[in-house]
Amino acid sequence: QRQMCIRDSTPAPGQFINETSTIGGMTGNETSPEAAVAWATQRLKDKLHVSLGSFGGYIIVGFDHSIPNSGNQYDFCVQGNAFDGSSEPGIVWVMQDINGNGLPDDEWYELKGSEAGKEETIQNFEVTYYRPEGKKMDVQWISSDGRNGWVDYLSAYHTQDYYYPAWISENSYTLTGTCLAARNTQDSQTGYWDNQSYDWGYVDNFGNDQIEGGSTVDGSGQRNGFKISNAIHADGTEANLQYIDFIKVQCGVLAKSGWLGEVSTEVFSFEDLTK
């Protein structure tokens, strides 16, 4: 059995962060990065979700082997819980362990998806999140394009004291990544929110790159397939990678859907499809 391990779990603030109820599944002892990784590791072993929170939140996994670029087929897949009307896209990044030290400290390459290169897609987008001054408060943020806003505190659903990760000691932190144009809309008659999908290339997205077997009703078992050949440099040119050793998934939208809260990518598993 080939093994995968989580190397980093740094979500943005969100409704599932620090949550100790059954849904969030935290213990309240996740007060260090190491404890957060241990918790996320157990979650994936239990086939439960890890939320990446709002825009820029990420998880990094490594493997005990390199995943080769197999050509035309999908090389690996990531499980989310998307279904029609409920997509929360995560951007995928890959890395080779060039220096051979077993750590994800080399260069990240984005895997292009359907939105890569579009005018409304922003690379190197930054959002700085600020620790709330008190309990049960919204989390304020400022983005690199000059906007400001907040991650809503949802008192009716997620009642933990803070949505700001307990294992981040700083009073603010900045997350960087590629930001897609949001596709969430509210029906003015029913009040229901619709998080529409993107064509292909994203985790937790009801796209045309899904692996068969997931539920279209509640998103359970929903997986998206990814090709190493889609790795690109920052300028959009092909990276031509022959293999990868690390995968990062980063929440790719800065948006919220009313009572549903922030749009936040969820991951359940990572699987090498070349074996």
Tell where the protein language model's regions lie, with residue ranges.
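Acidic, glycine-anchored loop motifs typical of Ca2+
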Residues: 98-107, 209
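Acidic/charged, solvent-exposed loop-and-adjacent secondary-structure segments enriched in E/D, K/R, S/T
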Residues: 11-52, 171-173, 178-231
